[in-house]
From Swiss-Prot:
Subunit structure: Heterotetramer of two alpha and two beta subunits.
UniProt-annotated binding residues for ATP: K46, G53, R54, G55, E109, A112, E117
Organism: Bartonella quintana (strain Toulouse) (Rochalimaea quintana)
Gene Ontology biological-process annotations: succinyl-CoA metabolic process; tricarboxylic acid cycle
Protein name: Succinate--CoA ligase [ADP-forming] subunit beta
The record's free-text note on cofactor binding: Binds 1 Mg(2+) ion per subunit.
Known pathway: Carbohydrate metabolism; tricarboxylic acid cycle; succinate from succinyl-CoA (ligase route): step 1/1
Known cofactor(s): Mg(2+)
Residues the entry annotates as binding substrate: N274, G331, I332, M333
Amino acid sequence: MNIHEYQAKRLLHEYGAPIANGVAVYSIEQAEKWAKKLPGPLYVVKSQIHAGGRGKGKFKELDLDSKGGVRLAKSVEEVVANVKEMLGKTLVTKQTGPEGKQVNRLYIEDGADIERELYLSLLVDRAVGRVAFVVSMEGGMDIETVAEETPEKILTLPVDPVQGVTSADCKRLCDALELHDNARKDGEKLFPILYKAFCEKDMSLLEINPLIVMKDGHLRVLDAKISFDNNALFRHPDILELRDLSEEDPKEIEASKHDLAYVALEGTIGCMVNGAGLAMATMDIIKLYGAEPANFLDVGGGASKEKVTAAFKIITADPNVKGILVNIFGGIMRCDVIAEGVVAAVREVGLKVPLVVRLEGTNIEQGKAIISDSGLNVISASDLDDAAQKIIAAVRGA
């Protein structure tokens, strides 16, 4: 689960991280009221959407030469003018796709006298099985680009889960970021704070880009992105309250109601599979034969007929889907249950695109018989390779 920048900053501030004074607003009237209460004279007006690249993004409704989704203002009047131009508009960034995201809230905060911009994040380093700091002097940039072009400029520092962030860890991080005097003292306080927040709140990513050194020599969190482990949210009702459903894909929201692992993608082949590994293999072979999957969907090992029906409805609700591939290896999951769910869903929502079904394992013969006796226009496949080729051929021939 993701949260907005202002929510992330508020959470980090509760742990003691240094942030600017700021307020989230939902209307022009609120913007004027609260901007007057900020010290000024420099303000920053930030679009709040779950996507990066906001500063370089463009609003669909405005001219191409208009400013992006993060703007500076030198007076309350300029703040209000920018809010009028940004609120309710559709912001397109490199992460939103061409459809963009509507800006329903803005964050207004004090400007900062920036001396240097740094990059800092915490994530789970699966190679060593530990939470790790990732830091770089190249703040404000796309860290993926830095990693690809100049990987030597990045330090990855795994943290011992027993000892936590040690003084030696702080020294390495401060040295890597070339922090001195007040900034170094701030860093020695900040790094353990961030690690504590990451672990206590079950985060999967905490990214500060940039972390700035101000001209007075102190550190400040200028931008923050936090993602949480969905499987741990039951422990954090306070975090669940921060969820903004308007920022999430409606299909993914519906899938979560049925305990389905679903991720929307940008392809045209809808996939329904049991097991994450088999689901990824299914997507891989679709790409191998020159097409793109429209989703990742794992119905799990013990799905019911109702769950399978719900999964099928979610796939068919995607207008980009031009064909559907059902790939089931029945171990705990029985092929006849899958077949019953598919048949029930097709009869309820109709079948407007080609459907290929590959079944293998427990009760395979019963499953095939259910589909065969249904009278539906379903293409059977003998194995995964055959299934992938058949669905792609059917879509291209449609």
